[in-house]
A protein has these predicted regions:
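Inter-Walker segment of RecA-like/P-loop motor cores
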Residues: 72-106
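Accessory alpha-helical DNA-binding modules that contact the DNA backbone or grooves
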Residues: 808-821, 830-916, 920-922
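Walker B catalytic acidic pair
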Residues: 125-128, 554
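Conserved helicase/translocase P-loop NTPase motor core
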Residues: 92-110, 365-369, 519-528
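Short basic/glycine-enriched coil/helix segment immediately N-terminal to the Walker B
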Residues: 95, 111-122, 539-545
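Extended, alpha-helix-rich binding/interface surfaces that flank or overlap catalytic cores
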Residues: 657-659, 663-668, 672, 680-827, ...
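Conserved RecA-like P-loop NTPase helicase motor core
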Residues: 133-134, 426-615, 619
Length: 922
């Protein structure tokens, strides 16, 4: 078996997993990194035929691009935008294949039924933990199961800790997915454990964990930051009784999922929380970032980040900055960069003052560990070269096979992001003092005097680097890899002015960097991919480089699993040594161990819940007994007589209620709730309004954040004007979004300015009605009440309004000067300006129109009155006109007495112009 075949061969647990996925319709929950791209590729490949029509939901752009490239099949399509029209998609669906599609497009196609839904082979749902009862994905599966009882549904999730949030989330996800069984694949699964734990030779499983000690200053900083975290958590639990849970503690406050845990407890009470509690939540986020930076960044970058969070502007936003612990953190951070020289005995005896601190930055302990690992690797490479040479001389028959084996050991260092990759590369090539000096020299936050010799060295280095040279660094992979810079560090940490440290676009697009000053290949690779544009990049790097030594610079659970699987897959061909760097008794170690503990706890609870779960027989909706498929127009308070009464809920086609919905609204859960109430939805591209309930009622839906933005920019006034022009009963719906409460923060100025602007809006548009809704469930009930006994809206009329409002106007048809002038007139907007341009041949003709003529042209009496008043009102008030007339008479009387006037007077309409008469002397 060659190396390529070894890299593509599936392990034993992967083979069993592939068969289970193909034959079973279940919810599969995996530990991080257990579900590999190789298994998914083989699953997708099984459905890339003309006889299959399979939709894949929840895939990121990077995953879609990866699988399209790897499958290399004409039956694999990506529909993520409106580039394919409805008729084109209909033809594509008819030809079959595998479709990576967005939920918004698929839900519209299912509602319009542009293809036979019963012909769909199945739906594959990725990231199933994100599905909610009224989400787009749940809406799609409900529409799918209503018309298709035979097709499969398969759901995957690699985030088991998400099932710990909320009450019985596993059962709710299975119910929304119409799945009766769940398959759990933790790391301690017997098959997974057997496949990854290599038996026999210890060299195949050689992993070296290097535990580093924190320096004295780092330990001081960590202790004080942890004190601030503990105090903030206890104070937060005191202020918010809903957080009195054992899960809310200082340990979980350090994890990345703490915000989700807080959201699960506080979403319902966010509006009742005072500003002090919100400030504490923001402070906890800052503490978590600083504790992460402490072990990840060098001393200069950490101090620069700390300066950003402790600046004078931040004192008014966070009270922790003036605490004693914060002062100790700042002093210790500065002490890592500047060292105070010790006094000599003579200076101590004479009582001399303290000497000026000198620039002696603390070297990152992990940098020193990497240097030792590389030196050890180089020695092994030299030893390996000698052994190969000896074996070649002793046995000529085996020389051909030995020649295939490279004597150099390739080293791959995994870091978290591109910034760490660049700084570590500079350290390995230039040394720590030069890198630190470069960061300080180019920082706006740090005011430290560098030694003159170091400044001269940096300046000469900058001049040398400005010349074209490929001496040290080269791009090792030309393939585009859009690695976005993650939450890596401060914006002003010294990386913004020097090209060797700056994260440039070229560095962002690199897969990895090769440091060429060493005798053996050394590559540095960032594994964090926040933009999700390069999925499965770690596995691709491992397979393409096939490193002999792997160094995990920043510990990450998913990265460790991916390396573990790669080692097991390459074990027959290659012995891989792995170095794991971590600080002993540090927050970094605690976060890593906590992630393992939480994942194990999640699977233990999932196993218990699975064992005690009661699943109804109709869960998979193979018949009409599943109540989740019923479309019930009645209220929750109405009594249900019997299970057979659901037949009476289905109305006849003639009595069906219809609501016209703008396609952009399908991002919310309101369309799903309306459909569940027995109301048919007609997706359209509406230019006026978001929901058309009746021929007379048009609704514009706004969340609180959208409302503030629309009021500030004036967009809401134009929308209200358009609704009032075409509908008798325009409605502004202000809906409170539950999910956006924790992340949305409004300033006091925004909230205080909303009411006056709403008052102005209602005064200008008296027919506009406002509805305040606490949530989508209440909104759906209000819509149903508003539609009772009313006529159904016509899609043709709504589209006619859209065409009339937008129209097709050629910009070169109109003179740009009067067009621009007219656009600035009161009452004129981008829609009705063309009505004036088409009616009037000139501005003179416009000025001669009566107010009634303007009303007929604009089809709006209010707009016509505003425009007419702007054209014909006097420019001066009555008092100003009287003063001007009196002044004109006095000037004329004065001129009659003067033989040689000093001023030339020009009388304009309602205005006097005085010009010095200098030319009269000539």
């Amino acid at each position: 078996m060659n190396e390529t075949e070894t890299g593509n061969a599936m392990l034993d647990y992967e083979n069993q997993l592939f068969l289970d996925i193909i034959h079973e319709n279940e919810l599969f929950v995996f530990a991080k990194g257990v579900l590999t791209e190789l298994v998914l590729k083989n699953v997708f490949e099984a459905y890339t035929t003309e006889t299959s029509l399979v939709f894949v939901l929840g895939a990121s752009k990077g995953e879609e691009a990866y699988f399209r490239e790897k499958l290399n099949n004409e039956k694999v399509y990506t529909i993520t935008s409106e580039e394919y029209l409805s008729n084109t998609r209909k033809v594509m669906y008819g030809n079959g294949g595998l479709f990576f599609i967005t939920a918004r497009i698929l839900v519209m196609d299912l509602l319009k039924e542009i293809f036979p839904i019963d012909k769909v082979t199945g739906i594959i749902l990725l990231k199933a933990h994100n599905i909610a009862e009224n989400s787009q994905e749940a809406f799609i599966l409900r529409l799918y199961r209503t018309k298709n009882k035979e097709g499969f549904i398969k759901a995957f999730s690699q985030t088991p800790t998400s099932f710990l949030l909320g009450f019985a989330k596993l059962n709710r996800v299975m119910r929304s997915s119409f799945l009766a069984n769940v398959s759990l694949w933790p790391r301690f699964h017997a098959v997974v454990k057997q496949s990854l734990n290599l038996p026999g030779d210890d060299s195949l499983t050689h992993v070296v964990e290097i535990q580093l000690n924190l320096t004295e200053e780092m330990r001081e900083i960590q202790t004080n930051l942890l004190d601030l975290v503990s105090w903030s958590v206890s104070e937060l639990k005191r202020l918010v009784p809903a957080l009195n849970d054992d899960e809310i503690n200082a340990e979980t406050a350090l994890t990345h999922g703490f915000q989700k845990i807080i959201g699960a407890h506080m979403d319902a009470e966010w509006n009742t929380i005072n500003n002090k509690a919100k400030e504490l939540l923001n402070d906890l986020k800052v503490f978590r970032i600083l504790l992460t930076y402490l072990t990840k960044f060098d001393c200069v970058s950490f101090y620069s980040a700390l300066c950003n969070y402790t600046s004078s502007d931040m004192v008014f936003k966070s009270s922790w900055i003036v605490s004693t612990s914060a002062e100790k953190v700042i002093v210790a951070s500065r002490g890592r960069i500047l060292k105070q020289p010790k006094k000599t005995p003579n200076e101590q005896a004479s009582g001399a003052g303290s000497k000026k601190a000198t620039f002696k930055p603390e070297v990152h302990p992990k940098w020193l560990a990497v240097s030792e690992i590389l030196n050890d690797t180089f020695k092994q490479s030299e030893k390996r070269v000698a052994e190969i040479a000896t074996e070649e001389m002793s046995d000529d028959d085996s020389s051909c096979g030995l020649a295939m084996k490279s004597p150099d050991l390739k080293t791959l260092i995994f870091v978290e992001d591109s910034r760490t990759c660049s700084v570590l590369k500079d350290y390995l090539t230039d040394g720590s003092l030069e890198v630190m000096g470069k960061l300080v020299h180019n920082s706006d936050k740090i005011k430290i005097d560098l030694p003159p010799d170091l400044i001269a060295k940096l300046n000469s280095k900058r001049k040398a680097d400005s010349e074209p040279s490929a001496k040290r660094i080269k791009i090792s992979n030309n393939k585009d890899n859009s690695e976005g810079v993650s939450e890596a560090g401060p914006s002003n940490d010294g990386c913004s002015k020097d090209k060797d440290v700056q994260i440039t676009l070229t560095q962002i697009r690199r897969k990895y960097e090769t440091v060429e000053v060493f005798p053996s290949p050394v590559m540095i690779r960032p594994y964090n991919n926040p933009n999700e544009e390069d999925a499965f990049s770690v596995n691709e790097t491992l397979l393409s480089l096939k490193p002999d030594v792997i160094v995990i610079f920043d510990p990450e659970l998913e990265l460790v699993r991916q390396i573990e699987i790669h080692r097991a897959r390459m074990a027959p061909q290659q012995n891989i040594r792995v170095y794991f760097l971590v600080f002993r008794n540090s927050v970094e170690e605690q976060i890593y161990l906590t992630s393992i503990q939480r994942e194990k706890l999640a699977f233990e609870k999932l196993i218990e819940e699975k064992a005690s779960m009661v699943v109804p027989n109709e869960r998979e909706a193979k018949d009409e007994l599943n109540q989740d498929l019923w479309r019930d127009p009645s209220k929750a308070s109405d009594a249900i007589i019997s299970a057979q009464s659901h037949r009476n809920m289905e109305q006849t086609t003639e009595g069906r209620e219809i609501i016209l919905v703008d396609i952009r609204e399908f991002r919310s859960e309101l369309p799903s709730l309306l459909h569940k109430r027995g109301i048919d939805l007609e997706p359209l591209t509406l230019d006026v309004g978001d929901y058309i309930l009746t021929p007379d009622i048009c609704v514009e839906r706004k969340s609180i954040s959208d409302l503030i933005g629309s009021l500030n920019c004036g967009r809401l006034y134009k929308q209200a004007e358009a609704m009032g022009r075409h509908y008798k009963k325009p409605i502004l719906l202000i809906e409170h979004e539950q999910k956006a409460q924790l992340s949305t923060r409004f300033g006091k100025n925004d909230l205080t300015q909303v009411m006056p602007k709403l008052q102005v809006l209602t005064m200008n548009f008296p027919n506009l009605r406002l509805i305040w809704s606490p949530g989508s469930h209440y909104t759906s009930e209000v819509f149903q009440e508003l539609k009772k006994g009313k006529d159904q809206p016509s899609p043709e009329e709504a589209m006619a309004i859209q065409k009339e409002s937008v129209g097709e106007h050629i910009s070169t048809k109109y003179n740009p000067i009067p067009h621009s002038f007219l656009s600035k007139m009161p009452g004129i907007d981008s829609r009705n300006v063309y009505s004036i341009l088409n009616r009037c041949e000139s501005l003179h003709e416009l000025a001669n129109l009566t107010e009634k003529d303007l009303e007929e042209t604009l089809e709006n009496s209010h707009t016509a009155a505003v425009l007419y008043a702007g054209l014909h009102s006097e420019t001066l008030t009555s008092d100003a006109q009287a003063a001007t007339s009196s002044k004109l008479k006095s000037v004329k009387a004065l001129m009659s007495k003067q033989k040689k006037p000093f001023f030339r007077v020009r009388v304009l309409k309602n205005r006097l112009s005085f010009t010095p008469n200098h030319n009269l002397r000539h």
